[in-house]
Design a protein with these regions (language model features):
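Adenine nucleotide-associated cytosolic modules
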Residues: 1-176
């Protein structure tokens, strides 16, 4: 929705900002056209109330998880592969991504979105759930998707919620 063929060659951060400002000219959008690193992520995230991660690679998911834990920020992680996706929300004191997947996989062993493809509507489903989680966190209404992983399968139109208790031996959040 944010990016069209007319945006080919443009930085995603610019095309997304431009479209969002056209939707609501009263919003303030801070953009960062740089690589997210273990050094820059905590500095950027500390300025925000809630972080939404929706990248297409595990390296970034672990980086966002680790940086948010380091600065005590709540966040939503979302991922898509082929016809489905998954999402979870973390607030301090609840399970983090490393509670479920303690060790980051070797990128060469995991197919990426470019090689296996994604169903655009599945992206919309997971993105809408992440947007809902963000609104629920900010407004304090409803029950967040903490200590759980929501798995959506668009090929069967099923949703499963997997219990994700905080791991007392988590290498990252068990100390927080």
């Amino acid at each position: 929705i944010l990016h069209t063929t007319a945006d080919l060659g443009r930085a995603k951060v610019e095309s997304a900002r431009d479209k969002l400002v056209r939707l609501n000219p009263n919003i303030k959008i801070d953009t960062y056209q740089e690589f997210l690193t273990p050094e820059t992520a905590p500095e950027i995230f500390k300025n925000y109330d809630f972080v939404v991660e929706c990248s297409d690679n595990f390296q970034t998911k672990y980086l966002v998880n680790d940086a948010c834990i380091a600065v005590g920020k709540p966040f939503s992680l979302g991922g898509i592969r082929m016809l489905g996706g998954q999402t979870m929300t973390h607030v301090p004191g609840t399970a983090c991504y490393r509670c479920l997947f303690p060790i980051e996989p070797d990128p060469s062993t995991v197919p990426n979105s470019s090689s296996v493809g994604v169903l655009g509507s599945a992206v919309g489903i997971i993105g809408s759930i992440q947007a809902t989680e963000t609104i629920k966190y900010i407004t304090g209404i409803g029950t967040l998707l903490t200590d759980r992983l929501l798995v959506a399968d668009a090929s069967t139109m099923t949703f499963n919620t997997i219990s994700l208790p905080r791991n007392p031996k988590c290498p990252l959040c068990s100390e927080k």
